[in-house]
Curated annotation (Swiss-Prot):
Subunit structure: The sodium/potassium-transporting ATPase is composed of a catalytic alpha subunit, an auxiliary non-catalytic beta subunit and an additional regulatory subunit.
Originating organism: Xenopus laevis
Entry's family note: Belongs to the X(+)/potassium ATPases subunit beta family.
Main function: This is the non-catalytic component of the active enzyme, which catalyzes the hydrolysis of ATP coupled with the exchange of Na(+) and K(+) ions across the plasma membrane. The exact function of the beta-3 subunit is not known.
Recorded name of the encoding gene: atp1b3
Stretches of the chain found on the membrane's Extracellular side: 57-277
Name of the protein this chain belongs to: Sodium/potassium-transporting ATPase subunit beta-3
Length: 277
């Protein structure tokens, strides 16, 4: 019985060896050299054809795209709003007596407003207010000046602490960029707070967003563009450590939406400020 098992094992091993290489027929794993060559040639041609077809398809598709402007823009017809400094949960918390508690906010604002410095904006165009700055035919797009000094006491020039040291912080409300957007009417940022005895002051006056900063032509062609912003100074009448909820919306333009239950940042932004002694 043991001899029969050994004989079976030897036979099985011999069959495997013969399958891997059969010297009598000149076969490797059941195929001759010419058979393997034909199979390899077939797959080489087949996958080469697929790669060529994919490359051709991608090339044709890329010919239909503009390097500077997205092909499909109909799904983003109205811009969203965001604030600076942007913190986790859009909650700004600090103690006015502890400099370290708000220095990160101050540094963020300085970094954000650096491109708005008057020395940099002097290189841009002085544009007539209230008019679109159309440049469809221009290859190199120019930019209208938006000077940092127009943000008044929220510019960080008069008060390097942006009001945080006195417990009256400044928050920058910015509009997200959309290529080709032309707001109608007289757009402006308007903010409200449910907390009583809170004064909101805007820079520029009335939270105005001038039309001369539109349209935007894209990052690649509109190199020096800076979007218009509105600074909001939040001045509570007392410091009770109560959380101040502020909601800012775009108003005054019928083609800019500010209400959408599916997108809480479409034309609006809500943030909270908590100030302690």
């Amino acid at each position: 019985m043991a001899k029969e098992e050994n004989k079976g094992s030897e036979q099985s091993g011999s069959d495997w060896k013969q399958f891997i290489y059969n010297p009598q027929k000149g076969e490797f794993m059941g195929r001759t050299a010419s058979s393997w060559a034909l199979i390899l040639l077939f797959y080489l041609v087949f996958y080469g054809f697929l790669a060529g077809l994919f490359t051709l398809t991608m090339w044709v598709m890329l010919q239909t795209l503009d390097d500077s402007v997205p092909k499909y823009r109909d799904r983003v017809s109205s811009p969203g709003l965001m604030i600076s400094p942007k913190s986790a949960g859009l909650e700004i918390k600090f103690s006015r007596s502890k400099t370290q508690s708000y220095m990160e906010y101050v540094q963020t604002l300085n970094t954000f407003l650096a491109p708005y410095n008057d020395s940099i904006q002097a290189k841009n165009e002085f544009c007539p207010p209230g008019l679109y700055f159309d440049q469809d035919e221009e290859v190199e797009k120019k930019t209208c000046q938006f000077n940092r000094t127009s943000l008044g006491i929220c510019s960080g020039i008069e008060d390097p602490m942006f009001g945080y040291g006195e417990g009256k912080p400044c928050v920058i409300v910015k509009i997200n960029r959309i290529i080709g957007l032309k707001p109608e009417g007289n757009p402006k940022i308007n903010c409200t707070s449910k907390t009583e005895d809170v004064n909101l002051q805007y820079f520029p006056d009335n939270g105005k967003i001038d039309l001369m900063y539109f349209p935007y032509y894209g990052k690649k062609t509109h190199v020096n563009y800076v979007q218009p912003v509105v600074a909001v100074k939040i001045s509570p009448s007392n410091f009770t450590s109560e959380e101040i909820a502020v909601e800012c919306k775009i108003h005054g333009s019928r083609n800019l939406k500010n209400e959408d239950e599916r997108d809480k940042f479409l034309g609006r932004v809500t943030f909270k400020v908590k100030i302690t002694e």
